[in-house]
């Protein structure tokens, strides 16, 4: 049996203010092309279908079209909700969609019934486990001791009564200990959301979602396929791909990947303003890629973003790396928060959010605003 493993579509996502919907439509068409070439027996989608719990109408239409295209190919689709999704919204209409071969994880109630597929070696049981927090599992099993994500997943998996004599697959959307994260993924304080890979010992393949970098963790059969597109510059060096799973008899699993080529790549470049605007620098490159440009000039270039976008229209982010910015970073790191004034704290926050300092006019405005607030609060 051949399966295609996808996750983290994040339909409707905006990156640095740029809508990714057209790029998402494009990459889903590329995935359909790969499906037509590889002829899988089913498609697995491991959560974060949408980027928001309440997706835009346009994002819903993109998913609807993709699922319809898969259903027209008579391909079973097995899909779960992730931490970005609303489990209730993703599950809506699920029982009706089963008639078209689209199986969606219901809202978790403690019971997970497998979807059973067949091939020459017999049954393949596929369990759909949506993103879970410990609180979700505690509500269903109040007598169990559940103090961590590992406890929660161990209890949830333990209730499945897995038959070790057949091939078992799991779709889930969690952070497995030891995996590498990216900036575009939600983080929890102190890594509290980590799940130990031993929880999944009873499965022949675990189709993970949540992390955007394709990787295996705790064994080749426990795998994040990664997101189909780059959603932050921390992913700039990643090769996005589709994961294909080849299931033979019990215990025989092979994994391979097919690279994905996006409509626009997401890249980082650096150099002086004169260098990056020189024709010899950008000639022959895809100047309409999504770019983070770091200028190394010692002085700020007036209207740099506007000038650079004349060459690089999809410039997403601009910052400087020079003596001044490096000194500012060192100063920020050295100064304890309690020693900074409200204005200094806001200036740091602004720089972190915008990758550039406030102008003098902005600084004066914020200073006046802070003074007004302090005067109003004074007894």
Task: Give, region by region, the residue ranges found by the protein language model.
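Divalent metal-coordination and catalytic microenvironments
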Residues: 8, 28, 48, 63, ...
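Short beta-strand segments at enzyme active-site cores
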Residues: 41-47, 79-81, 167-171
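Binuclear metal-dependent phosphoesterase catalytic core
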Residues: 112-120, 124, 129, 222-287
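His/Asp/Glu-rich metal-coordinating catalytic cores
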Residues: 55, 84-218
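Accessory, non-catalytic peripheral segments of nucleic-acid enzymes
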Residues: 37, 42, 247-379
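N-terminal active-site segment of His-dependent metallophosphoesterases
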Residues: 1-68, 72, 363-372, 376
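Catalytic-core regions built around general acid/base machinery
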Residues: 62-74, 194-203
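A short helix->loop->beta-strand "cap" motif at the edges of active sites that frequently abuts
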Residues: 72-77, 166
């Amino acid at each position: 049996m051949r399966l295609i493993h996808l996750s983290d579509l994040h339909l409707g996502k905006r990156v640095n203010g740029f809508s990714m919907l057209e790029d998402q439509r494009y990459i889903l068409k590329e995935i359909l092309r790969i499906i037509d070439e590889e002829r899988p027996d089913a498609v697995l989608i491991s959560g974060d279908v949408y980027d928001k719990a309440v997706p835009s109408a346009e994002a819903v239409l993109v998913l609807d079209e993709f699922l319809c295209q898969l259903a027209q190919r008579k391909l079973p689709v097995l899909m779960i909700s992730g931490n970005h999704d609303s489990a209730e919204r993703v599950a809506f209409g699920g029982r009706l969609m089963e008639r078209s071969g689209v199986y969606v994880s219901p809202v978790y109630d403690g019971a997970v019934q497998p979807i059973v597929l067949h091939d020459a070696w017999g049954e393949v049981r596929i369990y759909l486990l949506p993103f879970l927090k410990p609180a979700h599992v505690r509500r269903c099993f109040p007598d169990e001791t559940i103090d961590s994500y590992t406890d929660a997943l161990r209890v949830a998996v333990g209730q499945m009564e897995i038959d070790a004599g057949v091939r078992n697959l799991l779709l889930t959307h969690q952070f497995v200990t030891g995996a590498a994260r990216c900036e575009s993924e939600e983080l929890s304080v102190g890594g509290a959301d980590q799940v130990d890979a031993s929880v999944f010992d009873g499965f022949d393949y675990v189709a993970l979602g949540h992390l955007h970098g394709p990787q295996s963790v705790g064994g080749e059969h426990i795998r994040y396929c990664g997101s189909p597109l780059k959603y932050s510059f921390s992913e700039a060096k990643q090769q996005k791909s589709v994961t294909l799973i080849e299931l033979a008899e019990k215990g025989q699993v092979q994994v391979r990947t097919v690279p994905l080529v996006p409509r626009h790549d997401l890249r980082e470049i650096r150099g002086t303003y004169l260098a990056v605007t020189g024709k010899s620098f950008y000639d022959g490159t895809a100047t309409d890629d999504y770019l983070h440009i770091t200028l190394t000039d010692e002085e700020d270039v007036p209207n740099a973003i506007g000038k650079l976008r004349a060459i690089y229209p999809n410039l997403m982010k601009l910052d400087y790396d020079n003596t001044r910015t490096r000194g500012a970073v060192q100063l920020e790191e050295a100064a304890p928060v309690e020693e900074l004034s409200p204005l200094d704290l806001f200036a740091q926050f602004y720089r972190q959010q915008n990758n550039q300092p406030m102008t003098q006019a902005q600084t004066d405005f914020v200073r006046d605003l802070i003074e007004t607030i302090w005067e109003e609060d004074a007894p």
